[in-house]
Amino acid sequence: MIHSLFLINCSGDIFLEKHWKSVVSQSVCDYFFEAQEKAIDVENVPPVISTPLHYLISIYRDKIFFVSVIQTEVPPLFVIEFLHRVADTFQDYFGECSETAIKDNVVIVYELLEEMLDNGFPLATESNILKELIKPPTILRSVVNSITGSSNVGDTLPTGQLSNIPWRRAGVKYTNNEAYFDVIEEIDAIIDKSGSTVFAEIQGVIDSCIKLSGMPDLSLSFMNPRLLDDVSFHPCIRFKRWESERVLSFIPPDGNFRLISYRVSSQNLVAIPVYVKHLISFKENSSSGRFDVTIGPKQNMGKTVEGVVMTVHMPKAVLNMNLTATQGSYTFDPVTKVLAWDVGKITPQKLPNLKGIVNLQSGAPKPEENPSLNIQFKIQQLAISGLKVNRLDMYGEKYKPFKGVKYITKAGKFQVRT
């Protein structure tokens, strides 16, 4: 299926390649580079590119393109999911999926790729199995390996490989047994100039950190599970129980993993946590314009909006901007015409405001349209959809674990039109 894999950084350098069947020349990536040049940004690079002899299927993660080379037709989503699993495995092993981390652990990277694909077909993709096959890097292990010449590859078959629960290794023991869940939601929204919501959607995930001894059987229930759409499950979840009772029943993997991802697409369920008052105007036959923006939290949220950053791609005719910020700091790049305002935390008592004069190039015509405002923010201990965990029950073991749930709401693609 997958003949080769190329890892390419943002500069267009191929810094790692792996071949399973026959060696494919790096020149095949020229088709990818052509598509990359035509794309406006990295998100617009086509995930599937057809060439005379191959198909190139790629993903973009953490400033790295994972480009796979296929010679026969396969379901593209199957390959894309596998590439995401590769990136997740690197993240799990090295703490980050970056070019530096991959280069620093290049031997382990090749060992992982050799185990994850067998002759080009996915074989072992579960983190627990891989960690028994190939030990994660540590400073001590790296020193020992360099002295003895040994590798990180284990010499025994993983205990979960032949089990009907392949995602969990046997004989797990912890002094402190704990189960923590992070409910993380990203809100994508488009707000028109009058403040009305044109589009709103929530993308959510539940990330888990499970450190429980033995073979625990968990049940996680919610206050309002019916609001979830398009739920994607980890293989450990019993789907029939979810269908009938809307309860997540599962024997968890050991360590960190993504339990589910979901979407809330009903617009009446999506609460917009911030509002923006704006006045951006340009006059005919004038070399200046006016810029005035205020950001505030919606009164019904009850939580602090923090980490607020506003980014504006100003028209090409803008020469510079003389602004005053009542809170935070701003920068304007005269080359890229990007205005960035780092607001920080919003307090309802004193709303942050940015206003001043926009200077245009002399003789330049009035900009045809006003720019859009892109807002980033974060709200701790709030799931904007209203999703709440009801309880976590454990069966099969007699100890009492520590349990905790954390909620985070973040802005995804949050745009305000002016």
Curated annotation (Swiss-Prot):
Subcellular location: Golgi apparatus; Cytoplasmic vesicle membrane
Alphabetical list of PANTHER family matching this protein: AP COMPLEX SUBUNIT MU
The UniProt record lists the keyword Methyltransferase: no
SUPFAM superfamilies hit by this protein: Second domain of Mu2 adaptin subunit (ap50) of ap2 adaptor, SNARE-like
Pfam family, one: Clat_adaptor_s
Purpose of the protein: Part of the AP-3 complex, an adaptor-related complex which is not clathrin-associated. The complex is associated with the Golgi region as well as more peripheral structures. It facilitates the budding of vesicles from the Golgi membrane and may be directly involved in trafficking to lysosomes. In concert with the BLOC-1 complex, AP-3 is required to target cargos into vesicles assembled at cell bodies for delivery into neurites and nerve terminals.
Membrane topology category: Peripheral membrane protein
A single Gene Ontology CC term: Golgi apparatus
Domain MHD: 176-417
Annotated protein name in UniProt: AP-3 complex subunit mu-1
Organism for this UniProt entry: Gallus gallus (Chicken)
Family: Belongs to the adaptor complexes medium subunit family.
Signal peptide boundaries: none
GO BP: any one term: anterograde synaptic vesicle transport
Protein keywords: Cytoplasmic vesicle, Golgi apparatus, Membrane, Protein transport, Transport
Quaternary organization: The AP-3 complex associates with the BLOC-1 complex.
